[in-house]
Each structure stands twice: as C-alpha cells, then as structure tokens.
Amino acid sequence: GALSGPVIGGILTIVGFGSFGKHLFNCMPIMVGATFMSYITEHTTQEPAILIAILFSTTLAPIAGRYGTLVGIIAGAIHLTLVVNVGFLHGGVNLYNNGFAGGLVAGMMVPILEAIHVHRVARLNPQRPEVDPAEEVETLS
C-alpha cells in the first residue's frame, strides 16, 4: 500500500512502544494473523485502513509474547475481523476501531488462555503447588 501519513504514524507507534517490550518476535505473529485474515476476506493489504489495522494490531503483542506464536496468529486474525466490523460504532475512526477491537480480543482470549496455561503448567510440573489465578491477581493489588 501507499506510505501515507497514518501508515507512517502506525510504524512510529510500533517503534515508540519498542521501549515497553514490543519487539519483532511478539509483533510478527499478530501481524501475520491479521495479514492472513485480510487475504481470506474481501479486504486487500493495499487499503490504507487495512494497513493501519495490521500495524495497530500489535497492541496484542503481549499475548503472542506470553502464549506463543500460534495464539498470536489467531489473535491477529480475530483482531482484523473485529476492526472491519465495529467501525460503525464510532464513525469509522481507525484508532478507536483498533483500540476497541484489541480490548475485545484481549478480554476474550486472556482469561481462557490463562486458565489453560495454569492447568498446563500444573500438569507438566506436578511438584509445583496448585495456584489459583484469582489469588494471584488479588496479591498484585
């Protein structure tokens, strides 16, 4: 697609958040999933709105960093699907679309993934004491 102002802004946003732990290995699975979803739907990566959505989908990079590449690809695909379908809620403003869609994806996936992760860790390491995720959250506050 064209290298326009919003696309450059998206690239600079990714670079800026690099100081907070966003890097190639947790951004690429998300972007691959979003790009894959754009190819199997009627949207093309030449559209500026889709390019911006793919760039801002890296808001889900912590999910790929914690739960792995496959989960990151799935999160990116779900993110792009939501971005193109929730635009009517706030007049098509892409930044709001991406933030809202990222929040929905994280809100849906993280509790499920955390429950699976806790049980998987307990199964792989039987000597480790059982941990309740709710108690872990309570101790953080």
What is the predicted role of each segment?
Residues 1-121, 133-138:
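Pore-lining transmembrane helices
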Residues 125:
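Catalytic phosphate/metal-binding cores of nucleic-acid and nucleotide-processing enzymes, i.e., regions
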Residues 129-130:
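Transmembrane helical cores of multi-pass ion-transport proteins
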